[in-house]
């Protein structure tokens, strides 16, 4: 959410930013917000003037009564009562205006970083760099669920009977591999200086609206019936929520947390073979990282965060590349975002395995996450988040890139201690 003062003073910048994000339907909101802001300030001024006049007039009542001027005192009382009624009327309108103003402000997108390429959607994202050499083996790489089935490692039919589409049972070595990836990711991030965190897996609506747009909320979140609670779609929301309504001395920043959690999302593709299996599902696990920092440090932390993901994948010999998300692919709260994609030998192309985002002060402004400077002045922090690894998608990349012609799957050195020392997985069928 933008600062209303910024919108008031820079309406054309805000409108051009909306055009750059190809959201022209929101242009009228800028003028509407400015009108509501003007009305809100005028109401406050009138209420303040009325209260001052009422206080001044009220003092006359006692003096008039002492002088025996009862009739004049009664007239003054009527004036005071009329002022009070007008104040109540204006206060009610002020509440309505402020609610409408906030509602519209939360729909206007954040100002994107000048370095963000302008484009309509993810097809116009820009490749930044490749890490590792993509390999296409001289044998056919099966679909990831077919590989898993060779190890009796997945049962989607049973999961479908239990929970419906978008769920799975992982079994045996594949389930162990999944857990090994998470354990390694946890230790990897702790070694990078992040504090390990196990957060709540449900959050209240004020936290949900503080960390994402209404559109994202509708598309992603499962609401608990009869409760002001939502299942988290990612642990970054719960971790950022930890700092709601806080004021942190700037010398105590940055706050760097990493968390493993299950994630629950309504989204699921309806078409296309790549939507089968564990690529896009309702429930999955993820190792996430967040940073709460001073504004001048957020760009530096942004680069550190996405590099963590690249480094993690490279320890498992999986080629990856980074993509700069274009303006139209950025969610409304994001200032800048980079996707990390892993190489798929089967598809002979890269696919998304993680995303790193700088939210600027958008989440902090909504959640009142503030910093106190050495001069005692307070300002909003910047927040960032990044995926270290989401094991379901990592399993796809891992199995495809480590599969051998005879069906064995090699286990990189980094994971072996979490797999009981195993150097490979041998298919059972």
Which residues are covered by each model-predicted region?
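TRNA-recognition modules of translation machinery and tRNA-sensing kinases, especially anticodon-binding
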Residues: 27, 130-429
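N-terminal alpha-helical targeting/anchoring segments
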Residues: 1-134, 149, 153
């Amino acid at each position: 959410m933008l600062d209303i003062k910024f919108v008031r003073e820079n309406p054309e910048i805000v409108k051009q930013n909306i055009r750059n994000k190809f959201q022209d339907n929101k242009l009228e909101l800028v003028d509407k917000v400015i009108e509501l802001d003007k009305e809100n300030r005028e109401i406050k001024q009138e209420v303040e003037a009325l209260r001052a006049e009422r206080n001044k007039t009220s003092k006359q009542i006692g003096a008039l009564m002492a002088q025996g001027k009862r009739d004049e005192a009664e007239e003054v009382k009527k004036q005071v009562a009329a002022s009070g009624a007008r104040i109540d009327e204006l206060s009610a309108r002020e509440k309505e205006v402020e609610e409408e103003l906030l509602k519209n402000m939360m729909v206007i997108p954040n100002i994107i970083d000048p370095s963000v390429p302008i484009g309509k959607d993810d097809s116009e994202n820009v490749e930044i760099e490749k890490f590792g050499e993509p390999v296409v083996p001289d044998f056919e790489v099966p679909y990831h669920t077919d590989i898993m089935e060779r190890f009796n490692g997945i049962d989607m039919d049973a999961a479908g009977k239990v929970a419906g589409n978008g769920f799975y049972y992982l079994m045996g070595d594949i389930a162990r591999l999944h857990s090994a990836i998470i354990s390694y990711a946890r230790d990897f991030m702790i070694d990078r200086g992040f504090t390990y965190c196990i957060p709540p897996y449900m959050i209240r609506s004020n936290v949900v609206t503080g960390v994402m747009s209404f559109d994202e909320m509708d598309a992603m979140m499962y609401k608990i019936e009869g409760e002001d609670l939502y299942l988290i779609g990612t642990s970054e929301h719960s971790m950022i929520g930890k700092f709601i309504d806080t004021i942190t001395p700037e010398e105590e920043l940055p706050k760097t947390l990493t968390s493993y959690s299950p994630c629950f999302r309504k989204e699921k593709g309806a078409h296309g073979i790549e939507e089968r299996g564990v690529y896009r599902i309702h429930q999955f696990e993820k190792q996430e990282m967040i940073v709460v920092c001073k504004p001048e440090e957020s760009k530096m932390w942004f680069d550190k965060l996405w590099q963590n993901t690249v480094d993690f994948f490279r320890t498992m010999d999986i080629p990856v590349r980074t993509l700069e998300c274009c303006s139209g692919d950025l969610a409304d709260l994001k200032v800048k975002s980079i996707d990390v994609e892993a190489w798929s030998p089967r598809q002979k192309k890269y696919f998304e395995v993680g995303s790193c985002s700088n939210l600027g002060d958008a989440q902090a402004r909504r959640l009142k996450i503030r910093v106190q400077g050495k001069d005692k002045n307070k300002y909003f922090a910047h927040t960032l988040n990044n995926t270290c690894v989401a094991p379901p998608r990592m399993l796809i990349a891992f199995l495809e890139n480590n599969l051998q012609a005879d069906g064995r799957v090699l286990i990189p050195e980094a994971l072996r201690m979490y797999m009981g020392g195993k150097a490979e997985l041998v298919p059972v069928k």
